[in-house]
Amino acid sequence: MQILLVEDDNTLFQELKKELEQWDFNVAGIEDFGKVMDTFESFNPEIVILDVQLPKYDGFYWCRKMREVSNVPILFLSSRDNPMDQVMSMELGADDYMQKPFYTNVLIAKLQAIYRRVYEFTAEEKRTLTWQDAVVDLSKDSIQKGDQTIFLSKTEMIILEILITKKNQIVSRDTIITALWDDEAFVSDNTLTVNVNRLRKKLSEISMDSAIETKVGKGYMAHE
């Protein structure tokens, strides 16, 4: 597994690198924190571990840059005790978030879970679902409607897949949260709401924002 570890604390970087390499992860770091994208593009990581507080530009800035060109899974690290950091990370399309200090074995478990969730279907045939007059490509995280195509983050696609496989049925928020994250403590009602809102915003680009209905106090429903 190729891991890009964007961490400016060299002591922590070396500790994590040593631990991750014991699990056969290939870990790369950053030499110039003004050129994170250069390393990102040359190393081609399968997962990015991204610190929030970095020199020159913060982790949120680099997350935006990465999302412009890739849906690679991103796990944020932060020493700040600020719930809005979690919300911001979800708004930007991150897959998980951990607050420092943390147990390394928990980080490794999260990385393994993310890898399984994101890459377990890469060797399988193309997987598609039909929803209204659109085709949802689960292998490419895309939705095609006519000549229009939109691309979703992995998290958004997981939410959508859960909903459209249970069309016209209410899916509880707890069900979605359980499917998304192994560590449910990471997810609040607000972070799930943020993800659904981001999904709806993308669906609006193909005039399908009303296809997912909020059932207040119950969950969400995708209409046939």
UniProtKB/Swiss-Prot annotation:
GO MF annotations, alphabetized: phosphorelay response regulator activity; transcription cis-regulatory region binding
Location in or out of the cell: Cytoplasm
UniProt keywords, alphabetically: Activator, Antibiotic resistance, Cytoplasm, DNA-binding, Phosphoprotein, Repressor, Transcription, Transcription regulation, Two-component regulatory system, Virulence
Knockout mutant characteristics: Decreases the resistance to vancomycin about 2-fold.
Record-linked InterPro entries: CheY-like_superfamily, OmpR/PhoB-type_DNA-bd, Sig_transdc_resp-reg_C-effctor, Sig_transdc_resp-reg_receiver, WalR-like, WH-like_DNA-bd_sf
Pfam families: Response_reg, Trans_reg_C
GO biological process: regulation of DNA-templated transcription; response to antibiotic
GO cellular component, as recorded: cytosol; protein-DNA complex
Known DNA-binding region: 126-224
Residues bearing PTM 4-aspartylphosphate: 51
PTM annotation (Phosphothreonine): residues: 128, 130, 149
Domain Response regulatory positions: 2-115
Record's comment on post-translational modification: Phosphorylated by GraS. Phosphorylated by Stk1; phosphorylation increases the DNA-binding activity of GraR.
Assembly with partners or alone: Interacts with GraX.
Its job: Member of the two-component regulatory system GraR/GraS involved in resistance against cationic antimicrobial peptides (CAMPs). Upon phosphorylation by GraS, functions as a transcription regulator by direct binding to promoter regions of target genes such as adhesins, exoproteins, transporters, toxins, and proteins involved in cell wall synthesis. Down-regulates the expression of many genes involved in RNA and amino acid synthesis or glycolysis.
Name of the protein in its database record: Response regulator protein GraR
